[in-house]
Amino acid sequence: MGMSLESMAIEMPKVFGHPNRVGFRGVLTVVDAASDKAPAGARGHRVLLTRAAAEEAIPSLLGMALDYSPRLDGHDTRRKIGVITRAEIVGREVTVAGFLYGRDFPEMVAEIGKNPTHSQRARMNGVSGNPKHAGEGIPAAEAGLGMSYEIADAVVEDIKANVWILNQLTFTGAAVLRRNKAAYKSTWIELG
């Protein structure tokens, strides 16, 4: 099985120790797989982002904002905490990276910093049984923070279908939210 990689980035000048530029990276979504639940705006339908649509839309992610809602349970496009400077498709994952406004939003940097890293999550999920995240009663795969994309100009193959297949879209941003609130539970975000 071969790995496919499509990548784009905005080259940011290196500024050592910049107080308002804290790096982040993570998985925004997956391609060619139905969402675990219906995202906001999909009228109760699960969605499937096709690889072709994602490849075409990757450039629209660059320079878009990363936002959050105070309860980390949805989107709030007026609370912009960072910017996406890199987006790529690795296998079936749409990965992103960029910068958080660390000086402006130290509480969000701290919250994301508490999130288990990708390798820690893999170890938690590798334990036999159904591991729980510390005291929350949530399976480790759903614990912590994830991400969700924001889009416009979506073309849905069949709006009567149970799963909406997205064949075209424009990314307009992304949100940080609790993984158990995300449409795709395999999303994640970490500092780095």
Task: Say what each PLM segment does.
Residues 1-62:
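Polar/acidic, low-complexity leader/linker segments enriched in S/T/G and N/D
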Residues 6, 13, 31, 62, ...:
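A structural detector for beta-sheet-dominated domains
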Residues 7-17, 78-89, 155:
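Short amphipathic beta-strand and strand-loop transition segments with alternating hydrophobic
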Residues 22-26, 64-66, 94, 147, ...:
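A broad, low-specificity signal marking well-ordered, structured residues that form hydrophobic/aromatic
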Residues 23, 29-40, 56, 72-76, ...:
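Short, surface-exposed beta-strand/loop "edge" segments at domain boundaries and coil↔beta transitions
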Residues 60-75, 147:
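Short conserved beta-strand and strand-loop elements enriched in small hydrophobics
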Residues 69-72, 79-85, 134-136:
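Short secondary-structure capping micro-motifs at structural edges
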Residues 86-192:
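Residue microenvironments linked to proteolytic maturation
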